[in-house]
Amino acid sequence: MLNPLRHSSLRSFHDGLMRLVVLAGIVLAAPLLTPGRPVAQQKPLHLNPVIAKLAEGKTVYGLNTGDLSLVYAREVARAPVDFIYADLEHNPLDFPALHMFLMGMTDKATILKKGNLQPNVALFARFPPEADQSQWVVKQALDIGLHGVIFNGVDTKEQALFAVKTMRYPQLKGSKIYQPAGIRGAGPANATWLWGISGDEYERHADLWPLNPEGDLLAMLMIESVEGLENLDAIASTPGVGALFLGVGNDLTHSMGVRPGSPEVEVGFQKVLSACKAHKIACAITANTANDLAKRVKEGWNIIRSTVPVITAGRALLGER
């Protein structure tokens, strides 16, 4: 025989539970039902870890190399850095080796642990041709799957504009960022394989940041001459330029006719930094010691090229983890 008291208690419990479910549904649905109240949307994931950090206002640290061995590729993939660039200007121009190096940096264990397709370390490259002669190497580099290109010897706005165009696909009609009009040819099968996305997805990601806030390619222009310093504002203001880059400054000192370490060189460095800040693009420099690294970061440089020991020690001086 059914116990009426027990039946009443069960019914009360059931009714109470249903009220909680309905209330929870109302609370969860409230943002959708409230007129004029936008629903927060998750930001799209940048597949370029350097851009992901720069977009958040962080400093990024990296290396350069001429060693394109698979052994070093595996080492770099787990190094405590954000990028590495292959220096193919002062080392043999070897695209098959560059391709294998990028494949060697593909760390499936890290991808699985991270839970998304963003690598820990981005790969850029620097090539022999000057900026206005670089279309063919840029096409090769991006179709291999690189995350960005460092252009040598950018002296004028025209050279900067051409560099940008070589990295962009032609845009769809009606695009708000149609210009600068891209001239990159379509054929990124190797890149899509390494990025782990479809061709359509790759075309959405393969645009220049910060011109396209969702872009994952970075155009970095090296200032290496007095002429480049004279045209800094015109170069830095070119839409699509992501960063200005200074190496150790040897070519710049040669152009100035002075020795490394001369005061004129540092004045030139500071002009580059000021132009980057004025036009809200990233600014890259080389640091040879931990103290130099800390000094440059405090000045506002947000892309630092050095070595792992210097980066580790410099970040410790800055109180960074």
Task: Pin down the residues of each PLM region.
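Bacterial N-terminal signal peptides
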Residues: R19-T34
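N-terminal secretory signal peptides that target proteins for export/translocation
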Residues: M1-M18
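Expand to "…catalyze enediolate/carbanion chemistry for C-C bond making/breaking, isomerization
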Residues: P38-R321
